[in-house]
Design a protein with these regions (language model features):
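N-terminal amphipathic/basic leader segments beginning at the initiator methionine
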Residues: 1-20
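Mg2+-dependent prenyl diphosphate-binding active-site environment of isoprenoid biosynthetic enzymes
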Residues: 17, 22-128
């Protein structure tokens, strides 16, 4: 199971890194990367893959959907740490996004990850 989790996390991260390289949000790439890749096991992707196997959904499609879910998760964590919310200085032992960068960049990076999640899902849905 741990090997599966590691493979799914690696594949999800690979998809996300490749996808973010295509983005035009040049000023926000660093805080988005920091928020997305600051640790975490990508357990949501693993759950998605396990459930998707039951319904014979392709692994590639499940990784794509899992990547979108991870973007939503990162967005919620970035926004949760903001001064107007929990005002947390650290997330997973590292400076939170608004502390590493600034509050405005954290808000925009989180919002961008939210948008990217739906962009990933809509492009995935159009590929039959």
């Amino acid at each position: 199971m741990l090997n599966d989790l590691n493979k799914i996390a690696k594949d999800t991260n690979f998809f996300l890194k490749k996808y973010l390289r295509k983005q035009k949000y040049s000023g926000l790439i660093s805080p988005m990367n920091y928020g997305l890749f600051s640790g975490g096991k990508k357990i949501r992707s693993k759950i998605l893959v396990d459930v998707g196997k039951i319904f014979n959904i392709s692994y590639k499609k499940l990784i794509t959907i899992g990547a979108a879910v991870e973007c939503i998760h990162a967005y919620t964590l970035i926004h949760d740490d903001l001064p107007c919310m929990d005002d947390d200085d650290y997330r997973r032992g590292k400076l939170s996004v608004h502390k590493k960068f600034n509050e405005a960049q954290a808000i925009l990076a989180g919002d961008s990850l939210h948008d990217i999640a739906f962009e990933i899902l809509s492009s995935s849905a159009s590929k039959k």
